[in-house]
Regions:
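An N-terminal assembly and electron-transfer interface module characteristic of large anaerobic redox
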Residues: 1-175
């Protein structure tokens, strides 16, 4: 025992090392557990959403939005080395963070699946989660990385591909 029993570890208490929930896994499954429309229900076709940067937290919103508009949502897979390697040729700078570099592979994956409409908005301001929050803006990379994708993934120059990357502030209900 620790002298004086002032340390909560010293009096014989042990942490429960079993049954510890993996909250990251729980959140990930909750965010990405939506089932897209079947092709016959998706009268407007498919929309591709890359599983990158700000699209993690906002995916439930965008999935619901496009599903209500009768699009079949195609989500890129979980990031891995193969996804990274798919987009490596279009990465313009080594100075970007790794999550941003992954975005190139996710968009390329969607294109290789035959998705002709890809939606990847630029979000400078996120929604206010609680009133005490004094700022809720994304870093400059997250805010505008879709512009980088648009200008560096050559396949997006194909006139049959629609790449939408509007600048939207989720704090403004008008947008």
């Amino acid at each position: 025992y620790i002298s004086g029993n002032r340390c909560e570890r010293g009096i014989g208490k042990q942490k429960n090392k079993e049954n510890i929930p993996n909250l990251f896994d729980y959140k990930y499954k909750k965010i990405f557990s939506y089932t897209p429309l079947d092709a016959d229900q998706a009268v407007r076709g498919k929309v591709g959403i890359p599983r990158v940067l700000n699209m993690f937290e906002n995916y439930p919103f965008w999935f619901t939005f496009f599903t209500k508009l009768k699009y079949q949502v195609v989500l890129s897979p979980t990031s891995n080395r193969k996804i990274y390697e798919l987009g490596i040729e279009s990465i313009p700078s080594e100075s970007e963070c790794y999550p941003a570099k992954l975005a190139h592979g996710h968009v390329t994956w969607l294109l290789r699946q035959g998705v002709k409409f890809i939606f990847y908005p630029c979000i400078p301001y996120e929604r206010t989660e609680f009133p005490e929050a004094i700022n809720h803006y994304n870093c400059p990379i997250v805010t505008s990385y879709a512009e980088n994708i648009k200008n560096n993934v050559d396949e997006l120059n194909d006139p049959s591909i629609t790449f939408r990357n509007p600048f939207l502030a989720l704090t403004n209900e008008e947008t």
